Each structure stands twice: as structure tokens, then as C-alpha cells.
Amino acid sequence: MLFSKLFAPTLKEPPKDAVLKSHKHLAQAGYIYQVGSGIYNFLPLAKKVLDKIENITHKRMQEHGAQNILMSFVVLASLWEKSGRLDKYGKELLVFKDRKDNDFVLSPTLEENITEIAANFIKSYKQLPVHLYQIHTKFRDEIRPRFGLVRAREFIMKDGYSFHEDAESLDKEFLNTQSAYKEILSDLGLDFRIVEADSGAIGGSKSREFVVLTECGEDTIVVCKNCDYAANIEIAKRSKRPEPLNVPKAQLAKFPTPNTTSAQSVAEFFKTEPYFVLKALVRKVIHKDKETLACFFVRGDDNLEEVKALNALNLLGANALELREASKEDLNNAGLIAGFIGPYGLKKHVSYIIFDEDLKEGDCLIVGANEKDFHAVGVDLKGFENLVYADIVQVKESDHCPDCQGELKYHKSLEVGHIFKLGQGYAKSLKASFLDKNGKERFFEMGCYGIGISRLLSAILEQKSDDLGCVWTKNTAPFDVVIVVSNWKDEAQKKLAFEVYERLRQKGVDALLDDRDARFGAKMRDFELIGERLALIVGKQTLESKEFECIKRANLEKQTLKDTELEEKILEMLKSE
């Protein structure tokens, strides 16, 4: 490829609204062009990288038995209504009408579509298991699209779905796909982790995320310093904590506690640890057609994990869509006083009450008395009947691992893949069944598997690039080598550059010849910005010495290559990371 023919409209400066280096580099180097909020055009350089990512993905998925299909981007809204997700998914789901007043959605995910296909064409256990996948455009109407391709509204995704006759078969395919994803991300040269995760709006009994470790990441994962335990903070667990020595032993009594509305101030008032203070967190629960209140109790030195809290509510059958912090008006209307909320008589004020599981058999507690400026001491939760316990706290750094007791630490991460065990939920709601070996009708067990293809461009750059521009991994760079001519007006340099260009191409090297009549410094700046893996310099000294200067983009390390061994050395360098 000649640079003069390459459509790569580089910019002098990155966009002013670009925050992440991946967004800055992709826009400035001419990889992407923004159409609107969270919507991007992929220009030739980006398309080359995307093609490489997609080819690796196709190769590994098909090696693991998955079959490639292509489904409609536009889906009937009635399918989403049948599955119950039309309302649950919220405003991120873009719904529109055609000229005949039929409702459709732009798919952010395709469980409904693929389940309908299975329902129509898979009739017998003999056709199972089957794993179908696609790489296609998706749309999610993000309220605040940001960070370039990291949080876009329109994006490219590899999504796959598997159908099984029983849970055992699903378990095998779940692990099979996990292996495929590990191979894909390893081929892409990424440093990644597999973590336990919440299933969110997709649903299902179990899910795992594939995350890239990067400080720009929107997610926090919790990892053990001693073992392989890793989980998204939304579902991370910890071992049971030891009780502090300073136990506030007291008979049950009510004490005046003026202006002590926080767990810390209550602990200081009674000269004890926040561990023994019962912290009440009231949330407004948003249902499909109503709003209620829920109160969550945790120890005073803990914080509520909102995702765990929502999941705990739904295990009670609440069918909650989301949680919002209760306002002062909400509390007043319910007859509650912020800072003094406790379990006594609380059932008449809220619809749901959940205690963190760390409070099981909790005693010597200090709790709000549901009366302004009063707390109760010496409270033993064993004296209450039918309390509901669940894991609802957010794990803290320095908490201990549930597997080995090692210390837990936080890491910022960016999700690039997610796999789910969906079970029979979608099959039941969409009436997707088959006949088993006994001729009995049964619902499919389903799995769901996704990789953010376009997001991977940003993930690679966030992990590998520097302040100068793009640094791609071995299998993702748009070109292997760029040949940079020091003085394009020198016919001898130009002639040698074309000769080298042809020699490398004959060896299968994807080379770019910078044939522009531009300053040498400007050409090198574009090399640093675009991120070809190697730059091969052709200059006056090359003509005299028959030696080339070669620069690795990853670390800007320079090497001198003799003309007689040029192709051999270039191929060696390209094979290395």
C-alpha cells in the first residue's frame, strides 16, 4: 500500500472532548470519525484492525464448534414483550414504529431473536447441542455515551447462543466457550482476567466477565493477592470478619442521641466501633407500574452494594427494575427519620427489609429507635422473627478472600467479554421446546456469550499505547512495516524504497510505503501516531552503508539491519511480541 493512496485523515490535535488516550489516538490518527453522540464511522485503518480481530474471533469460535450466522439488526418488539424485557431493559432499548404502526427495536442483544429461531427449527434432542454466533452491529441508547468506542451507542459485537437438552450439556459448552474466549484474547495480546459477575438485564444463573486491566476501566474487580479468586465488585464475596474486641455490652435500652445521624458519630457517642452500629439504607424501588420503599441494614463500617441489593429484592419476588436513593420527602411520607431508622416497628413503614448476612445472630448492636434523636442499645437480632438475610455489602480492600483468607485488592478494569448460563428463562417465556429421548416436551437450556469487537480497539490501546500514539499488538496492527524515505526527492532513495517494498511484500509482509513528499519528521510523527509495528528508514546513509535503521513502535527501540539479511530480520522481529 502506498501512503499517498491511503485514506487516513490525521488531525493536528485530538478532539477536545476526548478523555481517554484510545479515543484521542483513534480520532487523531484517522481511524474513526464521529457521526453523532456515541456513533462512529470506521475508516480504512480501523477497518483493517477490526478485520483482524474478527478473523481471530471467527477462527477460534469455529475451532470450538460454533457456527456463524447473521441475524436481523431490527427485531419485533412483540418478542421482547413476550420475554418480559421490553420494560425491564429501560430507555437504553430504542423502540420505533414503521409506517404500518408496528413496533420494532434496534437490538442491543438478540436472545429473543435466536430463541425464536430455535423454537421453529430445533424439534428434537438429536439436533442438540448447537452453538450459533454472529458478528454484527448493535445499538444501546446510552444516556451518557463517552470515552469513544468504550461506551458507544452503536457498536460491533460478537454474540453467540447455545441450546442444550440439559444443564450438564450447558455446563460443558460454558467452559468450552470460556476456553475459546481465552484463546481469542490471548491471540490479541491482551492482559486479561476472568471474573465472576452479575448477569444484569441478560439474566441467568451464572456469568463470568473477561476484563482487561487498565486504569481507564469503568469497572472495579476484586482480586485475591494469594489465589486466583477474582470477581466484579458487584458480586464479590469475602470471608466472615472477626468481631472487634471492644464489644459494647449493655442491657436493652433507649438512649437520647441528639444530632448523631451517621454510623461513625453514633459509634463515637457510645465509645465503640462502627461495626456494632446498625446502618439503615432506604431505597426507592422502581417496579413496572409502582414504586415502593426497601430498607437494607448493614454494619456501620460497611457500604451497600446496589446490584447485590437489587438481586436480593428480586429473589423475594419484588420484580424490581432499579433502586434509587430515597429522598427526604420519601422518608417523611413513610414516617421515617433519617439517621434514626431501626428495625423496631419498621414493617409498617417500608415494603421490604433485608439484613446483610454478616448480621446473622448479631448482638450487642446499636440501632435507630425510629424516633428523632434516639437510639437503642443492647439489641440482639435473634429476638426478631422472620428476618431476611442476604449478601448485600460491597467488599472493601483488605477484606479477606472467601477461598483462602488472603487479602483482597481492587483493580480497575474494562469489560470486553461476558458469558452467561441463561437456563430455561427465555425458552419458557418464548415457548421454545423440543422432544427429549423419551418423547417428552422440554424447554431448552440456553447459554449466551458476547465479545465487544469494536470496544477491543480501545481496550488494546488503553493497555498498550503511549502518549505519542497507537501501539498495537502483534496480530492487530494495521500494517507490519512502514517504509519511511528520508528525502523523497532523492531518486536513489526512492528507487531503493520501492525495491525494499517489493521484497517485503513477496515475503508476505503487509508493508506501507510512505511515498509522500513531506518532511521526514512529519512522516515519523505519523508512524508514532498510527502505530505500524516497525518503521524502516531509507536515507542517504542507507545508500552508502547498505544498512537500514529499523524502529519498533512498541518501545521505539532502534536496530541496524544489513541489506543482505533484511527480510530475515524483519520476519523475526514481526514474530516476536
Curated annotation (Swiss-Prot):
GO terms of biological process kind: prolyl-tRNA aminoacylation
Alphabetized InterPro entries for the sequence: aa-tRNA-synt_IIb, aa-tRNA-synth_II, aa-tRNA-synth_II/BPL/LPL, Anticodon-bd, Anticodon-bd_dom_sf, Pro-tRNA-ligase_IIa, Pro-tRNA-synth_IIa_bac-type, Pro-tRNA-Synthase_IIa_type1
Catalytic activity: tRNA(Pro) + L-proline + ATP = L-prolyl-tRNA(Pro) + AMP + diphosphate
Protein EC: 6.1.1.15
Molecular function terms, GO-annotated: aminoacyl-tRNA deacylase activity; ATP binding; proline-tRNA ligase activity
Cellular localization per UniProt: Cytoplasm
Family matches, as PROSITE patterns: AA_TRNA_LIGASE_II
Enzyme class, UniProt record, top EC level: ligase
Highest taxon, organism lineage: Bacteria
CDD domains linked to this entry: ProRS-INS, ProRS_anticodon_short, ProRS_core_prok
Job of this protein: Catalyzes the attachment of proline to tRNA(Pro) in a two-step reaction: proline is first activated by ATP to form Pro-AMP and then transferred to the acceptor end of tRNA(Pro). As ProRS can inadvertently accommodate and process non-cognate amino acids such as alanine and cysteine, to avoid such errors it has two additional distinct editing activities against alanine. One activity is designated as 'pretransfer' editing and involves the tRNA(Pro)-independent hydrolysis of activated Ala-AMP.
Quaternary structure annotation from Swiss-Prot or TrEMBL: Homodimer.
Name of this chain's protein: Proline--tRNA ligase
Organism expressing this protein natively: Helicobacter pylori (strain Shi470)
